[in-house]
Swiss-Prot record:
Predominant location category: cytoplasm
Family listed: Belongs to the endoribonuclease YbeY family.
Cofactor note: Binds 1 zinc ion.
Enzyme Commission designation: 3.1.-.-
Entries under SUPFAM superfamilies matching the protein: Metalloproteases ('zincins'), catalytic domain (SSF55486)
Protein name, per record: Endoribonuclease YbeY
Length: 138
């Protein structure tokens, strides 16, 4: 169990490792950081020039030995879950898969061809892990 406001089960965190290993064929050292709305907004503004909160930000460093930082905002994830009529756990799973694909080199902001591939992969992984975790009928 990862201790946050929501006490997130480790299986969700392991999903990031599994997706990056599958996509890259190697291990990525990943730090997960849970932030308040204010802090994630500040980082979003500083690094992306976007002055708003977001659910996740991913930063990848290095070429051969990859290291990544994934910043998550539980409050925004919770809001998005309600907005999309989803459970918190399903929304978290989607966000973590999205971040894992960024860690694996996929981008959706600057490359539209890559964006389609990324979102197709995201959906496939999401369906796979929903089934794996018995969440596909919830």
């Amino acid at each position: 169990m990862v201790t946050t406001n929501k006490n997130i089960e480790e299986k969700y965190i392991r999903t990031v490792d599994e997706v990056t290993r599958n996509e890259l064929g190697k291990e990525v050292n990943i730090n997960l950081v849970f932030l308040s709305k204010e802090k994630i907004k500040k980082i979003n503004r500083e690094f992306r020039n976007i002055n708003s909160e977001t659910d996740v930000l991913t930063f990848v460093y290095g070429d051969d030995d990859l290291f990544a930082e994934i910043y998550l905002c539980e409050d925004v994830i919770e809001e998005n879950a309600k907005k999309f009529s989803n459970t918190y756990e399903k929304e978290l799973l989607m966000v973590l898969i999205h971040a894992a694909l960024h860690c694996s080199g996929y981008d959706h902001e600057y490359d539209k061809t890559n964006a389609k591939k990324m979102f197709d992969l995201q959906e496939r992984y999401y369906e796979k892990y929903l089934k794996k975790y018995g969440m596909d009928n919830v």
